[in-house]
């Protein structure tokens, strides 16, 4: 359900292969799908650094690897393995400012360890 490119990948064991494996967070809190910003789409996955689990491209935890969509009145649609969906409105000034940039929105800095939007996504992976 979550992305790892191949079984030999070092993080393959961290992937969910069955619904029963989704335990931390559980199916009602684990992010399954997110609406990605059109200036961030570069492959078939949404990348995010996860505290105590994974950091990508030698970046800090306060870095947006991929960037969430804001096309729904400043919010993105997210879905969860238990089948429910939510609309997550972004509030952090750094998130809103980055979304207005005319450049490619990959590897954008967040506002730091207190970035509430980034923390919200990180808590759901």
Report residues per predicted region.
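Short, well-structured segments within or immediately adjacent to enzyme catalytic domains
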Residues: 1-125
């Amino acid at each position: 359900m979550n992305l790892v490119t191949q079984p030999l990948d070092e993080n393959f064991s961290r992937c969910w292969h069955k619904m029963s494996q989704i335990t931390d967070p559980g199916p009602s809190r684990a992010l399954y799908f997110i609406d990605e910003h059109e200036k961030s789409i570069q492959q078939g996955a949404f990348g995010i650094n996860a505290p105590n689990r994974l950091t990508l491209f030698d970046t800090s935890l306060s870095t947006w690897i991929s960037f969430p969509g804001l096309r729904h009145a400043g919010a993105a649609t997210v879905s969860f393995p238990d089948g429910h969906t939510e609309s997550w409105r972004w509030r952090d000034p750094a998130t809103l400012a980055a979304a207005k940039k005319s450049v490619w929105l990959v590897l954008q800095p967040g506002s730091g360890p207190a970035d509430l939007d980034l923390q919200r996504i990180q808590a759901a992976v």
